[in-house]
UniProtKB/Swiss-Prot annotation:
<dbReference type="GO" id="GO:1902459">
    <property type="term" value="P:positive regulation of stem cell population maintenance"/>
</dbReference>
<keyword id="KW-0479">Metal-binding</keyword>
<dbReference type="InterPro" id="IPR037138">
    <property type="entry name" value="His_deacetylse_dom_sf"/>
</dbReference>
<keyword id="KW-0805">Transcription regulation</keyword>
<feature type="region of interest" description="Histone deacetylase">
    <location>
        <begin position="17"/>
        <end position="329"/>
    </location>
</feature>
<dbReference type="GO" id="GO:0004407">
    <property type="term" value="F:histone deacetylase activity"/>
</dbReference>
<feature type="modified residue" description="Phosphoserine">
    <location>
        <position position="416"/>
    </location>
</feature>
<feature type="binding site">
    <location>
        <position position="272"/>
    </location>
    <ligand>
        <name>Zn(2+)</name>
    </ligand>
</feature>
<feature type="compositionally biased region" description="Acidic residues">
    <location>
        <begin position="397"/>
        <end position="407"/>
    </location>
</feature>
<feature type="region of interest" description="Disordered">
    <location>
        <begin position="383"/>
        <end position="501"/>
    </location>
</feature>
<keyword id="KW-0597">Phosphoprotein</keyword>
<dbReference type="InterPro" id="IPR000286">
    <property type="entry name" value="His_deacetylse"/>
</dbReference>
<dbReference type="GO" id="GO:0008270">
    <property type="term" value="F:zinc ion binding"/>
</dbReference>
<dbReference type="GO" id="GO:0006325">
    <property type="term" value="P:chromatin organization"/>
</dbReference>
<dbReference type="GO" id="GO:0009294">
    <property type="term" value="P:DNA-mediated transformation"/>
</dbReference>
<keyword id="KW-0862">Zinc</keyword>
<dbReference type="GO" id="GO:0005634">
    <property type="term" value="C:nucleus"/>
</dbReference>
């Protein structure tokens, strides 16, 4: 395989990309609890595939700097962050009122190392934004991120801290406009809610709509005030396949890119929209899912790739490995190399899994109506919004560890985490693990449909600074330390937004 340093030739556009990949070896150790479908171990499985396919050698591999309290409080309420920092399995019985207040308990359980987990995945997403802002990479990847349901004042849908909102706020320091695209099967409600009233962030969510968590994302939810028409929702039904999905995705996203002209794109790649997902009901193949990544990559705009949902974890690892290859411009072989988790992928031991023969309930007429309605809404946006020339806010401090000095294929330690999947027996470890559980499907999506949080918004001013409004509003503390990169300050914290051309 011919490399180009950290940058490989892409597909049809022929343009090279430099890719930064954020990974913390300890992220797979966190454990939501017995029977819970969210398994951070899937991130370690993904990393193992990347190592054995040789993809780590073609990226800059970085260990994220943990997000600090003040970083998280750029969006989240300070008392909520304080609660996450202090709560433990041993003390939770003494904080019943707080657990209810912040919606922590069942879907979002308290577990050992909860706050460190939040700091880790949020740090990777914010770190990716900083790298993109400084032009140090073209694509940044954090598969541990993408937890799109978390609200300002509460946890929701397995998500505690909304790393996506934090990453977008960081990107807004450099870019006038940021586009958020969500291909998770669940509506990206937390991100939409945060930016519902601003025209500097456009949110586009392709999701299952109906009696399904979180119950939001109607096609008529289009934004409010200056954000009107800057929220796009694409409601889909069970069984949508690759062809049907891209009848909507490509024309809609093509028009969005033409009209909105974002300076950066954040793509949440939730893998629960794949065929056969434990909590999902779509019928996308891995190649069909990855086609969305390939399409957004083709616009040559700084791109942040994040994870998200995905509960048949062997397929999650397959998907994100393949999509890492797409980001690099490498066609990853279907035949899987032998590695620590090889037995999980039997009996075929291949990267790709055939879609099922489930019924596609999305008729051609329905898809055309959705496409026409959304294109009509986009036609009401005459031009991309701009902001006045302003001083650029300082960068968030992200002194991540560059691991490129080591052999990329040997960076992962298979002994530091449990070898457990939906259908595997646990191996003893320093982290308590659950027993084997069946790979059953939950037709309602996530366990326990919860009422959507109301009244919390992020107001973004022209400089990229933010103010959170709603329940228990708090002041926003900006990070004040400039990022030092290889002994020099690249990009300069004093840079201002360029004037609109």
């Amino acid at each position: 395989m011919d490399t180009g340093g950290n940058s490989l030739a892409s597909g049809p556009d022929g343009v090279k990309r430099k890719v930064c990949y954020f990974y913390d070896p300890e992220v797979g150790n966190y454990y939501y609890g017995q029977g819970h479908p969210m398994k951070p171990h899937r991130i370690r499985m993904t990393h193992a595939l990347l190592a054995h396919y040789g993809l780590l050698q073609h990226m800059q591999v970085l260990k994220p700097f943990p997000a600090r309290d003040r970083d998280l409080c750029r969006f989240h309420a300070d008392d909520y962050v304080s609660f996450l920092r202090s709560i433990t399995p041993e003390t939770q019985q003494d904080q019943i009122r707080q657990l209810k207040r912040f919606n922590v308990g069942e879907d979002c359980p308290v577990f050992d190392g909860l706050y460190s987990f939040c700091q880790t995945y949020a740090g990777g997403s914010v770190g990716g934004s900083v790298k993109l802002n400084h032009g140090l990479c073209d694509i940044a990847i954090n598969w541990a991120g993408g937890l799109h349901h978390a609200k300002k004042c509460e946890a929701s849908g397995f998500c505690y801290v909304n790393d996506i909102v934090l990453a977008i706020l960081e990107l807004l320091k450099q870019h006038e406009r940021v586009l958020y695209v969500d291909i998770d099967i669940h509506h990206g409600d937390g991100v939409e809610e945060a930016f519902y009233a601003t025209d500097r962030v456009m949110t586009v969510s392709f999701h299952k709509f109906g009696d399904y968590f979180p119950g939001t994302g109607h096609i008529q939810d289009i934004g409010y005030g200056s954000g009107k028409y800057y929220s796009l929702n694409v409601p889909l039904d069970d069984g949508i396949d690759d062809e049907s999905y891209h009848l909507l995705f490509k024309p809609i996203m093509g028009k969005v890119m033409e009209i909105f002209r974002p300076g950066a794109v954040v793509l949440q790649c939730g893998a629960d929209s794949l065929s056969g997902d434990r909590l999902g009901c779509f019928n996308l193949s891995i190649k069909g899912h990855a086609e969305c990544v390939k399409f957004m990559r083709s616009f040559n705009v700084p791109l942040l790739l994040l994870g998200g949902g995905g509960y048949t974890i062997r397929n999650v690892a397959r998907c994100w490995c393949y999509e890492t290859g797409v980001a690099l411009g490498v066609e990853v072989e279907d035949k899987m190399p032998e590695h620590e988790y090889y037995e999980y992928f039997g009996p075929d031991y291949t990267l790709h899994v055939a879609p099922s023969n489930m019924e596609n309930k999305n008729s051609r007429q329905m898809l055309e109506e959705i496409r026409n309605d959304l294109l009509h809404n986009l036609s009401k946006l005459q031009h991309a919004p701009s902001v006045p020339f302003q001083e650029r806010p300082p960068d968030t401090e992200t002194p991540e560890v560059d691991e490129d000095q080591e052999d990329g294929d040997k960076r992962w330690d298979p002994d530091s985490d449990m070898d457990v999947d939906d259908d595997r027996k646990p191996i003893p470890s320093r982290v308590k693990r659950e027993a084997v559980e069946p790979d059953t499907k939950d037709k309602d999506g996530l366990k326990g449909i919860m009422e959507r949080g109301k009244g919390c918004e992020v107001e973004v001013d022209e400089s990229g600074s933010t103010k959170v409004t709603g329940v228990n509003p708090v002041g926003v503390e900006e990070a004040s330390v400039k990022m030092e990169e290889e002994g020099t300050n690249k990009g300069g914290a004093e840079q201002a937004f360029p004037p609109k051309t």
